[in-house]
Amino acid sequence: MPIGVPKVPFRNPGEDSSNWIDVYNRLYRERLLFLGQDIDSEISNQLIGLMVYLSTESEIKDLYLFINSPGGWVIPGIAIYDTMQFVRPDVQTVCMGLAASMGSFILVGGKITKRLAFPHARVMIHQPFAAFYEAQIGEFVLEAEELLKLREILTRVYAQRTGKPLWVVSEDMERDVFMSAAEAQVHGIVDLVAVA
């Protein structure tokens, strides 16, 4: 039986009584962010807003982004990645469950040395794709060109952030490549694997 988003007590500094707020708002106050769904414009804008706001509260306290996502739209994912690079605080990324497709791109975007995977987490990388649709040939060519540009961006970032040669990353992105947490560490997507 679904119960909705759980509520937890929270006391604002200087107040005597506690208020009940949803658990995510409580965790946000501790700089703990969650990406637990498909990446689209809405969740991208929410995470970007939270990162920018929290970075204005403190430029030195790290942000923690917990990821359990099957991936999603490329441009909103790149927007999250770019914001992670832009904000002053380090963004620590934590893979719990699955970081696939754009989820793995965001995972690799965490501060190098501060990217972690839980021991049974899975990571998957592949090239960006678009759904086939019926269109004029000119539109199809333009979409293919845009996909090639996006693939080049993703490949360059993965290579830079993992330390792997561009050709290795490019070959890996030709198909869905699933990795265990330990394999993701060897691949350079995460720096540490948590121990239970």
UniProtKB/Swiss-Prot annotation:
Q: Which GO terms describe its cellular component?
A: chloroplast stroma; endopeptidase Clp complex
Q: What CDD domains does UniProt report for this protein, alphabetically?
A: S14_ClpP_2
Supply the Pfam families for this chain.
Answer: CLP_protease
- Residues forming the catalytic site: 101, 126
GO molecular function (one):
serine-type endopeptidase activity
One of the protein's GO biological processes: protein quality control for misfolded or incompletely synthesized proteins
Coarse class of the protein's main subcellular location: plastid
Query: Which top EC class applies here?
Result: hydrolase
As its record notes, the protein acts as a catalyst of:
Hydrolysis of proteins to small peptides in the presence of ATP and magnesium. alpha-casein is the usual test substrate. In the absence of ATP, only oligopeptides shorter than five residues are hydrolyzed (such as succinyl-Leu-Tyr-|-NHMec, and Leu-Tyr-Leu-|-Tyr-Trp, in which cleavage of the -Tyr-|-Leu- and -Tyr-|-Trp bonds also occurs)
- What are its E.C. numbers? 3.4.21.92
Q: Which residues cross the membrane?
A: none
As for subcellular location, the record says: Plastid, Chloroplast stroma
Q: Please provide the record's keywords in A-Z order.
A: Chloroplast, Hydrolase, Plastid, Protease, Serine protease
Assembly mode: Component of the chloroplastic Clp protease core complex.
**Family from the record:** Belongs to the peptidase S14 family.
What does the record give as the function of this protein?
Cleaves peptides in various proteins in a process that requires ATP hydrolysis. Has a chymotrypsin-like activity. Plays a major role in the degradation of misfolded proteins.
Full protein name:
ATP-dependent Clp protease proteolytic subunit
Organism encoding this protein:
Populus trichocarpa
